[in-house]
Amino acid sequence: MGFLSKIVDGNKKETKRLSKIADEVLSLEEDMAILTDEEIKNKTKQFQQEVQEIEDVKKQNDYLDKILPQAYALVREGAKRVFNMTPYKVQVMGGIAIHKGDIAEMRTGEGKTLTATMPTYLNALAGRGVHVITVNEYLSSVQSEEMAELYEFLGLTVGLNLNSKSTNEKREAYAQDITYSTNNELGFDYLRDNMVNYAEERVMRPLHFAIIDEVDSILIDEARTPLIISGEAEKSTSLYTQANVFAKMLKAEDDYKYDEKTKAVHLTEQGADKAERMFKIENLYDVQNVEVISHINTALKAHVTLQRDVDYMVVDGEVLIVDQFTGRTMPGRRFSEGLHQAIEAKEGVKIQNESKTMASITFQNYFRMYNKLAGMTGTAKTEEEEFRNIYNMTVTQIPTNKPVQRDDKSDLIYISQKGKFDAVVEDVVEKHKQGQPVLLGTVAVETSEYISNLLKKRGIRHDVLNAKNHEREAEIVANAGQKGAVTIATNMAGRGTDIKLGEGVEEIGGLAVIGTERHESRRIDDQLRGRSGRQGDRGDSRFYLSLQDELMVRFGSERLQKMMNRLGMDDSTPIESKMVSRAVESAQKRVEGNNFDARKRILEYDEVLRKQREIIYNERNNIIDSEDSSQLVNAMLRSTLQRGVTYHISEEDDNPDYAPFINYVNDVFLQEGDLKEEEINGKDSEDIFEVVWSKIEKVYESQKAKIGDQMAEFERMILLRSIDTHWTDHIDTMDQLRQGIHLRSYAQQNPLRDYQNEGHELFDMMMQNIEEDTSKFILKSVIQVDENIEREKTTDFGTAQHVSAEDGKEKAKKQPIVKGDKVGRNDPCPCGSGKKYKNCHGKEE
């Protein structure tokens, strides 16, 4: 009880503090009333000028704290003139809590939308953008349209971000002082912004301040399902199949060389020639053919370096990796970089991962990137621990403007569901006779339809509220408080819209809320109850339960059933027991605790990918924002060469074999014959590095000389393409690792620690692959001097999807490609033979 009393005392203390500041705001009412409309706009301009002169975000916040009373008083006056509504003191208190970066818990009907206008206005003065976030696009559209009138009167601009808007329209919406959007669309825009190739293609500004309406729904209920942008799969899958067919046709030594020591396999001139004919391409080494080369190399590796029943097994149509140390299969683990798919193609089983995740993020990680985050809802106190631990937000319960008159009756418990529903229908019929409006809350859509059929049989006209239809939803909710109205709704439907009582309804008891089942979360039950008794209206609520309800079955209703049977109670007789209600609440707390633990676990795993995502996105943004990436390219070339020297050259070896190192250098940096054994024979690793480095520099300068001013554009294109290719592969690999990692707990291992360690190793490997690919394409791409390198348009963003919502889905756009440069007849042949193209692979032309 000590902990609970501390929370209660803390809320009391906070409410007192908010009340004091709110009184200060209210005391300025007369000062604002004498200002003309023009003077109000000028006051905004003055605030903007003063706050925007401060560059430091923390100091800006301090300044906003200082002007809060004046700013809030100004908004109150604006609301009075525009809407003929003046925010109450409790609304001002809620607005102060939101500005602080906390959650204002305000009961239904207390005017959360108007409450949000004050902190939105105040924080928008900083000129960094404020995002007002709703659960669906309908609410975003309605609120932005209604509130724009007030903000524009005060001198601020408002934007609306919808899924249907074009890139330019989105950019314009985000450029406004205040932007209304759904959580889904914000997350997708963030991911898409980190997939562009040019700075001017971004739509968002840096994330500054967000106010989330129905914050518990977005940050708690939707926290576990990630936002995903995925690419099309057909092309990728068919390429694995084609590469597999091609690999089967090749002959060892003639078409490819295999080094058993390093397990490296690469095409010979003859092999490259065959590939060009098979895939109907002119030059295998053109930049645009990177995907083809990658698939061929992977297919070769699958056929030549990996053996069935040694490196992997095929069990029930699935390729399972064999642990080289234990000899056991590793379910859930997959080879990375497309190798697993290549093996699946080789073995003729279904090629997995038809859609490739190009980018993903959870709401937990997206919203934690804002400088300041706040929210409002009718129900958040039960989840306060989660808000505090994960988002560093406190929940402040704001007092109601008028005392709550709703009568929350105790639960009625029946033996069977039939008995329960019969009783619900009788209750509705009785209330309907008196004209009292009834709102029936159900947990599932099927239950809504079942009750709807029962009411139809009794001749009761009613509406069924479907959360999928937002426009119809508002209309139904608007009528739900009228005399004689009966509305059936799933518990989550209708959020964000108030039920206002019709004429004469107050006198007959107000809105009656009937819950047909307890939800596993107390919060959802509280939301349903909160539909009644808004702004001091009369009303009542009651839950009807049965021992067959899912929650009761899960948490032991057998004992209760035996007791009811002993008492000889039949299906039509309920028990009304505080003990049972307490047991139900205890079961709900257990479920909430389990769900919190699951979300916390997901966050711990996601933290690994979050850090990696941050590094990759920063790297991409640096490349995009930089005019010249030559320093980065230089560092990658040196790093790749240094790794090659370290791996292949051992100074302790008295009789070193330089062939693997020379093959490596030829494969990544130089043409065949450029590095001779006598140039490095007998030298130590440092000298060998310098010998090769001087040759690399010459090749680099030669490439630069060919395209001159366009080198920066060429390097940017190669860097971004290499990063994106390997990053999307890495996301897939990490996902596969995560799916199978829980099995480690059976072997007394710590799955999270293993995931962190292996994830770190995979990331390092990916970074090395990016560097090696970049080195190879910068030095080995055949550049035609007289043809411009085109700016590469942004890659296809694929399909945006969020498991629990339809808002964010976007149709895949056609993918633009960069034209490859043809090989000049006198240029060195790209196959690495050292011959001129016309005397080698150019003979056929």
UniProtKB/Swiss-Prot annotation:
Top-level taxon of origin: Bacteria
What EC identifiers does the entry list? 7.4.2.8
Q: How is the cofactor bound?
A: May bind 1 zinc ion per subunit.
- The positions annotated for binding ATP are Q91, G109, E110, G111, K112, T113, D498
Q: What is its main location?
A: membrane
Q: Which GO terms describe its biological process?
A: intracellular protein transmembrane transport; protein import; protein targeting; protein transport by the Sec complex
**Membrane-crossing residue ranges in chain numbering:** none
Cofactor field: Zn(2+)
**What are the record keywords, sorted?**
ATP-binding, Cell membrane, Cytoplasm, Membrane, Metal-binding, Nucleotide-binding, Protein transport, Translocase, Translocation, Transport, Zinc
What positions does the entry give for Zn(2+) binding?
C829, C831, C840, H841
Q: Which Pfam families match?
A: P-loop_SecA (PF21090), SEC-C (PF02810), SecA_DEAD (PF07517), SecA_PP_bind (PF01043), SecA_SW (PF07516)
Stretches with biased composition (Basic residues):
835-845
Describe its partners and assembly state: Monomer and homodimer. Part of the essential Sec protein translocation apparatus which comprises SecA, SecYEG and auxiliary proteins SecDF. Other proteins may also be involved.
For this chain, the family text in UniProt reads: Belongs to the SecA family.
What's this protein's name?
Protein translocase subunit SecA 1
| Lineage of the organism | Bacteria, Bacillati, Bacillota, Bacilli, Bacillales
